[in-house]
């Protein structure tokens, strides 16, 4: 049974208030500096195309948008601003376990911001998703968030329960296992490639390289405790499809897709493997400029080989979109 239009208002009005925020969970700061997050990833301006593309994707896949939308893990609002401007439903609940991230996101909205949906902000940890009312939301959106969640299967089951039939849980910028494993395999060839070129690995280069490859191994492993890791998982589309099907969710997998691909001018944010690989090492892993210059120069052949394998189709799947639509009649 679909909740009445007033049920969201009744529920959200009854939530506890804490330091100006609605509160569903205890606060939890991000493991690194929230204030420095955008500069760390090279984000210099407010992004609107991600949210616009997200909403266009909903329309393309005929997702019900008559009910509220929920964003889990807004971070600095990379998805939020455009989604708030273009979401056609009545309400938009913006959440993060970090009050600092909520403030950074809220600060993007001026008094003259154009958007239909009413915006609400709540301190909320994704691990508490079972607290959400059954059948409340038309859309649950996440960008670069699922891999932070410890119990993925429980999370997907709880999201399915909180969705209306015809609604969707849409996740973007989520890491795919095979693509990142390929990146780590290429990275492991860096020392021998540089040695063959007469370049000696510096101790700080070895440290950063080992940090990357050991992180990939940590995320791939499924037999260790990941409770205290900030990032925890990589994903495999076939396993995700089976998991979604168990809970009445049909998966549409968009390999290498980014939400902004579905907004004007409708380009592809993912250009090729080599571009993503080099960007990731530079901005995410913080390889220094000298190290990056040597990698660009001496790994050209390896990177070109992979790019040529995907010269006419998208791939390999590294960072992708997972859209789960709740099928009519599903009761999970």
Placement of each model-derived feature along the sequence:
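Short alpha-helix
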Residues: 231-248
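Conserved class I S-adenosyl-L-methionine
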Residues: 1-63, 66-75, 82, 170-211
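Class I SAM-dependent methyltransferase SAM/SAH-binding core
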Residues: 78-128
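A conserved beta-strand element that flanks and buttresses the S-adenosyl-L-methionine
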Residues: 141
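A short glycine-rich, Lys/Arg-flanked "PGG" loop and its adjoining helix->strand segment in the class I
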Residues: 153-165
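Conserved Class I S-adenosyl-L-methionine
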Residues: 234, 238, 252-323
């Amino acid at each position: 049974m679909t909740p009445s239009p007033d049920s969201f208002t009744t529920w959200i009005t009854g939530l506890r208030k804490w330091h100006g925020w609605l509160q569903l969970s205890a606060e939890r700061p991000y493991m690194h500096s929230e204030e420095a997050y955008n500069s760390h990833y090279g984000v210099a301006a407010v992004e609107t195309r991600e949210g616009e593309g997200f909403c266009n994707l909903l329309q393309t896949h005929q997702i019900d948008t008559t009910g509220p939308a929920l964003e889990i893990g807004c971070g600095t609002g990379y998805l939020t601003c455009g989604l708030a401007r273009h979401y056609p439903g009545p309400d938009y609940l913006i959440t993060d376990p970090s009050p600092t991230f909520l403030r950074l996101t809220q600060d993007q909205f001026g008094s003259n911001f154009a958007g239909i949906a009413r915006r609400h902000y709540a301190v909320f940890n994704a691990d508490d998703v079972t607290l959400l009312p059954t059948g409340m939301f038309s859309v649950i959106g996440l960008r670069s968030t699922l891999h932070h969640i410890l119990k993925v299967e429980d999370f997907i089951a709880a999201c399915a329960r909180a969705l209306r039939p015809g609604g969707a849980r849409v996740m973007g910028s989520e890491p795919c296992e095979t693509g990142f494993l390929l990146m780590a395999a290429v990275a492991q060839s860096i020392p021998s490639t540089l040695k063959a070129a007469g370049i000696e690995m510096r101790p700080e280069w070895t440290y950063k390289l080992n940090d990357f490859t050991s992180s990939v191994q940590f995320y791939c492993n499924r037999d260790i405790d990941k409770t205290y890791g900030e990032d925890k998982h990589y994903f495999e589309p076939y396993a995700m499809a089976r998991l979604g099907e168990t809970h009445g969710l049909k998966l549409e997998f968009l390999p290498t897709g980014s939400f902004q691909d579905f907004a004007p001018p409708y380009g592809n944010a993912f250009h090729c493997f080599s571009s993503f690989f080099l960007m990731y090492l530079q901005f995410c892993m913080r390889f220094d400029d000298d190290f990056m210059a040597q990698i660009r120069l001496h790994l050209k052949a390896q990177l070109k080989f992979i790019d040529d394998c995907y010269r006419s189709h998208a791939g390999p799947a590294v960072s992708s979109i997972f859209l789960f639509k709740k099928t009519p009649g599903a009761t999970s």
